[in-house]
């Protein structure tokens, strides 16, 4: 569905959604509960941990 961009220059507390994919594969954004949280060294599947 909607894609979220990497939180490279953004704060990890919020992630803005964008149509383009993340530039880095290590950083991905996932949705935690109802809020969107950026993951640093975790994939979307393992985004439950900070």
UniProtKB/Swiss-Prot annotation:
Top-level taxon: Eukaryota
Any single biological process term in GO: sperm DNA condensation
GO terms of molecular function: DNA binding
Localization terms from the record: Nucleus; Chromosome
One GO cellular component term noted in the UniProt record for this chain: nucleus
Alphabetical UniProt keywords: Chromosome, Developmental protein, Differentiation, DNA condensation, DNA-binding, Nucleosome core, Nucleus, Spermatogenesis
Tissues in which the UniProt entry reports expression: Testis.
Biological role: Protamines substitute for histones in the chromatin of sperm during the haploid phase of spermatogenesis. They compact sperm DNA into a highly condensed, stable and inactive complex.
Family that this chain belongs to: Belongs to the protamine P1 family.
Protein name: Sperm protamine P1
Species name: Chilonatalus micropus
Taxonomic placement: Eukaryota, Metazoa, Chordata, Craniata, Vertebrata
